[in-house]
Amino acid sequence: MARSVFYYHLKRLKAKDKYADEKDNIKSIFHEHKGRYGYRRVTAEMRNRGFIINHKTVQRLMQSMNIKSQIRKVRYRSYKGEVGRIAPNIINRDFEASAPNQKWATDVTQINIGSTKLYLSPILDMFNGEIISYNISKSPNLEQIYDMLDKAFEKYDKLDGLILHSDQGWQYQHFGYRQRIEEHHIIQSMSRKGNCLDNAMAENFFGIMKSELLYAEEFDSPEAFIKALDEYIDYYNNKRIKSRLKGKSPVQYRTLSQIG
């Protein structure tokens, strides 16, 4: 090898990678979020950290490091039970809210861990997608719905005029459920029969959770999944950023809205 060629390659090896800091932070973000972030969310988090960088550069750097999100959205089957209608579809697919606690959504989804069936029932705020409260049970019963409501009411005691939207599941038709929300001056709204898009906020969360947690990891027991779910919901509320929330997590977005 000619001496000039040798020194040329040696100089290139010694040259500082101008994207070294960016690469370190990209790897840090990717692993912190357990590989759940693609290049767009990584870009938003990089900007939160003070980097001035566009998504194409982040995508190129991730490709050069062979980093790629393995998460893919999947369809899920929610638990419906018997259906009926006792409330109008007030929301009517208008999932926008200008402030917290104007519109909430709830639903129940079935989760299979081995031979055990679990049922997750959360309440989401349509303003920022935050999980207000939730209950996970081995049976889709009224007690889990009441517990979910009680936890939400412990967090917020003034909910006059709030709209709580659900599908036409039997739980939401029950007198006990209706009485509890009426006592807090909450307005009940129900999807049309068999129309999943009418409750897209809740269905979207279930799809994300199942993609990023249930199908991304292995659980040897229902208890292991429940523990992981508790950690995931805390992560989802406090750390997982969304493009529609201007690169903020649900809690960050709510906090900033209240400051402003």
Where are these regions (language model features)?
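Mobile genetic element proteins and their domesticated derivatives, centered on retroelements
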Residues: 6, 26, 42, 58, ...
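Short small-residue beta-strand/loop micro-motif enriched in glycine and branched aliphatics
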Residues: 8, 130-134, 188-191, 215-216
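Generic alpha-helical secondary structure signal
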Residues: 1-5, 21, 144, 148, ...
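C-terminal domain-tail junction helix/linker
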Residues: 182-186, 208-260
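Active-site beta-loop-alpha junctions of metal-dependent nucleic acid enzymes
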Residues: 116, 135-157
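Basic, flexible linker segments flanking DNA-binding modules
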Residues: 4-99, 195, 251-257
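RNase H-like two-metal-ion nuclease catalytic core shared by retroviral integrases
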Residues: 80-82, 166-168, 174-175, 190-210, ...
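An active-site-proximal beta-strand-loop segment
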Residues: 97-132, 138-140
